[in-house]
């Protein structure tokens, strides 16, 4: 291992050892009585500083280490617990906490105002109609009872609005009954990373409130791995209740469109060979490997 990663502090076992040392120091008899024999430590200022570096600075919670762990330890769960301890002490890195704070204050992590969001949607709708030469192409907003409530990453209206246009085009061509929300449209949740379950639950609640307000049938999480993980898997834990509607990734929906023939692909448009990446939150944590492969088999490309 040391040849693969010469920086010892980057090795997952080293990070785990720092957390386990504190556990032994506080919660085991031998660790309290004879810390020198067990390597036990108290959670003092120096150890807290070391934790910040280990679980925030040197860990993304991707879970790759657990796949290679000889005894199957769920390392991301341990590191999340350490982050929660640090969050309770106000030791979340400032830039990460600032992202959470702006989402709590404005409803999205980019601070996009409601007016700007709706203006962007209206503009992209016009662009979509011109692209397709079809005045019926729409981006519905707050459509009651729509089958699909589509949520987006705030970077799209802020920096990459054509991504929203591409999604809207697919929904239109598939004949989907869909809508976006005027409020509760941000799929991201950096509370997944800062270790504060109360703040994470508040951000997650915004999506659930939008679903309840509009009476939609399915919550679709757009392109974002951690957004899917937080809504689909962590959300029920934060809310202590399962949602009364399905929560799916847009990848699952696109896979279904391809299988059902609601959209088709032209093999002459793309000639490049590509490979399929199994991302951490969608595959290692989200269990969507079969979904990705099921969609990929419909693509007119060589893998």
Task: Identify what each model region corresponds to.
Residues 240-268:
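Short, flexible loop segments at boundaries between secondary-structure elements
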Residues 152, 249-251, 278:
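Short, structured patches in soluble enzyme cores that scaffold and shape functional sites
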Residues 177-179, 246, 302-303:
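Conserved beta-strand segments of alpha/beta enzyme cores
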Residues 9-230, 234-235:
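Iron-sulfur-cluster electron-transfer modules
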Residues 1-8:
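Long, charged N-terminal interaction/targeting segments
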Residues 174, 241-243, 299-300:
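Short, structured coil segments at secondary-structure junctions
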Residues 12, 20, 258-303:
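Redox cofactor-anchoring modules in respiratory/redox and cofactor-processing assemblies
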Residues 165-169, 236-237, 290-298:
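Short, solvent-exposed amphipathic alpha-helical segments in soluble enzyme
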């Amino acid at each position: 291992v040391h040849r693969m990663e010469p920086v010892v502090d980057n090795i997952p076992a080293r990070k785990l050892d720092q957390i386990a040392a504190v556990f032994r120091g506080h919660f085991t008899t031998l660790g309290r009585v004879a810390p020198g024999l067990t390597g036990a430590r108290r959670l003092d200022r120096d150890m807290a500083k070391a934790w910040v570096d280990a679980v925030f600075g040197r860990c993304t919670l991707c879970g790759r280490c657990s796949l290679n762990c000889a005894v199957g330890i769920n390392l991301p769960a341990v590191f999340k617990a350490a982050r929660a301890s640090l969050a309770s002490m106000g030791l979340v890195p400032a830039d990460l906490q600032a992202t959470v704070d702006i989402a709590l204050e404005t409803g999205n992590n980019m601070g996009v105002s409601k007016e700007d969001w709706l203006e962007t949607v209206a503009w992209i709708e016009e662009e979509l109609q011109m692209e397709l030469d079809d005045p019926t192409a729409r981006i519905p907003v707050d459509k009651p009872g729509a089958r699909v409530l589509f949520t987006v990453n705030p970077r799209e209206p802020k920096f990459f609005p054509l991504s929203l246009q591409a999604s809207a085009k697919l929904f239109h061509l598939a004949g989907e009954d869909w809508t976006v929300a005027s409020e509760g449209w941000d799929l991201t949740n950096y509370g997944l990373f800062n270790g504060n379950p109360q703040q994470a639950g508040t951000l997650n609640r915004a999506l659930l409130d939008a679903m309840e307000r509009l009476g939609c049938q399915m919550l679709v999480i757009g392109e974002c791995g951690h957004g899917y993980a937080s809504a689909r898997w962590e959300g029920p834990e934060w809310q202590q209740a399962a949602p009364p509607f399905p929560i799916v990734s847009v990848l699952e929906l696109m896979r279904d469109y391809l299988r059902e023939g609601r959209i088709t692909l032209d093999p002459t448009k793309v000639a490049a060979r590509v490979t399929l990446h199994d991302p951490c939150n969608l595959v290692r944590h989200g269990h969507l490997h079969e979904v990705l492969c099921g969609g990929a088999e419909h693509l007119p490309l060589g893998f």
